[in-house]
Amino acid sequence: MENMKQVVVATKNMGKVREFAELFERFDLEVKSLHDFPHIEEVEETGETFEENAILKADSLSRQLNAIVIADDSGLIVDALNGKPGVYSARFAGEPKDDQANIDKVLQELNEVAFEKRKARFYCALAVAFPEGDKKPVIVNGTCEGFILEQRRGENGFGYDPIFYVEEYKKAMAELSSDEKNAISHRGRALRKLEEKIPEWFLGE
């Protein structure tokens, strides 16, 4: 039963790992990441939706590691850019992944677009896959509404956080504390939905 108290987060992004660890710290649950399994290669994200990518990663890695795996696929959806960068958020400016280059590209494409027309949302799809073949993956999602700023603000977070304005706090996402961000973030909301859906033995309750 000991391995039931462990979950692998399917990412090497330490910003995401910290968010998962903070959100799960009240449970008797050990959070590991792909950094703990250096021999495992990240799964190529070939899905056309956030949900498809999350399930693809969780299912593949769960079978490889024989472990419970949480995978998320998340990104930024900007209305004025017809939904871009969307599922390509991490590589919007091309390879290799570069947060600053991605931000620069979004700001460039929104140049001269008025603030009230820069509505956007963060979207997160979370999938949990189990090594037992008879258990279907659990899938949930969460969103966070906001606007795209004209320039970076704040030092916290990662990804597009410095240009994402949260009206509730009147701050950029990167200006929020971890607790503030977890309360309203797309990933935080998805994880709270996940808590209601995953089996009791997974949470160790």
UniProtKB/Swiss-Prot annotation:
Catalytic activity reported: XTP + H2O = XMP + diphosphate + H(+); dITP + H2O = dIMP + diphosphate + H(+); ITP + H2O = IMP + diphosphate + H(+)
Record keyword Nucleotide-binding present: yes
Catalytic residues, chain numbering: 73
Pfam family, one: Ham1p_like
Residues reported to bind substrate: 11-16, 74, 158-161, 181, 186-187
SUPFAM superfamilies: ITPase-like
Keywords (A to Z) from UniProt: Hydrolase, Magnesium, Metal-binding, Nucleotide metabolism, Nucleotide-binding
UniProt cofactor(s): Mg(2+)
Enzyme Commission number, as recorded: 3.6.1.66
GO biological process, one term: nucleotide metabolic process
InterPro entries in the cross-refs: dITP/XTP_pyrophosphatase (IPR020922), ITPase-like_fam (IPR029001), RdgB/HAM1 (IPR002637)
GO CC annotation: cytosol
Cleaved signal peptide residues: none
Positions bound to Mg(2+): 44, 73
Principal EC category: hydrolase
GO MF annotations, alphabetized: dITP diphosphatase activity; ITP diphosphatase activity; metal ion binding; nucleotide binding; ribonucleoside triphosphate phosphatase activity; XTP diphosphatase activity
Cofactor binding note of this UniProt entry: Binds 1 Mg(2+) ion per subunit.
Top-level taxon in the UniProt lineage: Bacteria
Keyword Metal-binding in record: yes
Stored NCBIfam families: PRK14822.1 (NF011397), RdgB/HAM1 family non-canonical purine NTP pyrophosphatase (TIGR00042)
Family recorded in the similarity comment: Belongs to the HAM1 NTPase family.
HAMAP family attached to this UniProt entry: Non_canon_purine_NTPase (MF_01405)
Role of this protein: Pyrophosphatase that catalyzes the hydrolysis of nucleoside triphosphates to their monophosphate derivatives, with a high preference for the non-canonical purine nucleotides XTP (xanthosine triphosphate), dITP (deoxyinosine triphosphate) and ITP. Seems to function as a house-cleaning enzyme that removes non-canonical purine nucleotides from the nucleotide pool, thus preventing their incorporation into DNA/RNA and avoiding chromosomal lesions.
UniProt subunit comment: Homodimer.
Protein name: dITP/XTP pyrophosphatase
Organism: Bacillus cereus (strain ZK / E33L)
